[in-house]
Amino acid sequence: MQSIFIPLSFFVVIVYTFRIYNRNPLILALGSLFFIEMIWQFISIIWIDCGAYISEQLRYSYYTGASIRYTLLIMPFACLFPYLLDRNLKRKKITTVRLKLGSDKGISKQILYILCLLAIGYLLTNVLISGAIPLFSHINYSRFYDQYSVLPFARIIYDYFLPFISVILGGMAGEARKNNKETKIYFIAMGMILVLQLLLNCKFYGLYDYILQFVLGFFVFQYDLSKHTKFKLPIKAILIGLLGVGILLYISYTKYSYSEINPFQYLLDRVFALQYHTFWGIDKLHHEGLFTSDTIGFVNEILSGFLSLDISRLNPDYGIARVMYMVSAGTYARDMLSSGYLFAGSYLTVILSYVGYLFAFISSFILAFIVSKLCANLYGSILTKNYFAAFVYFYILKRYYEFFRVGNFAMILNWKFLVLYLFLFLMYIVSLRSNRNSGKGGF
């Protein structure tokens, strides 16, 4: 089954990506984190539903139709998000705006670059003098900042500012793309961020997302929509390539299938089944009639960020940590949580674990609307060099991505975010009043 359905899933992903690119490539740049996560989840659930080994349940999975149900649940987001973002970009008329970083109205590009370098150097120094570099000490970055961080405010800079710094560096590199010497210094600074991430033992998350954030900033200033060229999808070449992939999977899994010493099978199961095993587990409970709706628990989940000033993602009463106990065998979940690790999941998994498919389906519509607004406003703020507004939008967007990826409501509903939401509402009111005479919309 995997040798048939995985190539088919690749084909769907390629066609979907091409259609978005031909509509507006900026959509891919602004929503890259969400698209990659969604595509990985899509391929993962198909791989699992075709019979992957799930270590949390200590067994091979079997077909339950979970892949079909996931596709239906994510469909509103997959279809609406690109459409709404494209509409928002055109409505604001910001896709053709071209302004330069470091204008006379704001902070100069040189000073901004120096501040970015100082922040990166500060974080690198903190890791190097700590005496416990995570890469060589086998500890995660969270534990490092809790127990081994030396310099003050290092964690605040790392958690709140470093991701945005990667966007700013990308924007600078994009604007200076015709000056190779100047462009190199921004790429060097970005390279320092990646070195920091490696030292912090962030070998996957923390590498590709920072690279995509840099690309986002670069693309904002590098791309000119008026010169956009649409590409024709090479159907024959894609089908031939996917046929080869299917044959390779078939040979590999018929020759080496279910061998305890087969590294190829282990690698594929870890790559493809790493992401969405929790959804398969929760869906199986529904499928077997073992699920009991917990509406009160769902309300508490939504309010979890307001019940405590600093609620932990590892709290077994909420979010994906709660799901871990529902889908894992024995004490596996407890052992993972005690080590500081979460299973992979998403907002669909968490909502499905409380109130079922209907609310999960509706949530995809809501999330598509909110994320498209955030992406469009972030793009406009970066392009007009309103760094404060851009930072606020980017921070909120990152948290929505974490919610999209992990599913804990406390990530987007808490006291800190309540202040940010009120701030954005005030910005919107001010923008409406200032643009009323000119006939423009709000920010």
What are these regions (language model features)?
Residues 340-443:
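Hydrophobic alpha-helical segments
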Residues 2-11, 68-78, 112-124, 149-166, 281-292, 353, ...:
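Hydrophobic alpha-helical transmembrane segments
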Residues 57-61, 87-231, 244-257, 403, ...:
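Membrane-embedded catalytic interface detector for glycan/lipid assembly enzymes
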Residues 9-14, 165-170, 189-197, 345-349, ...:
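Hydrophobic, membrane-inserted alpha-helices
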Residues 1-99, 187-194, 210-254, 389, ...:
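N-terminal "leader" segments that precede or initiate the main folded domain
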Residues 143-152, 246-367:
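Small-residue-enriched transmembrane helix-hairpin modules in multi-pass membrane proteins
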Residues 22-27, 172-185, 377-390:
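Membrane-interface helix-loop-helix junctions at transmembrane boundaries of multi-pass membrane enzymes
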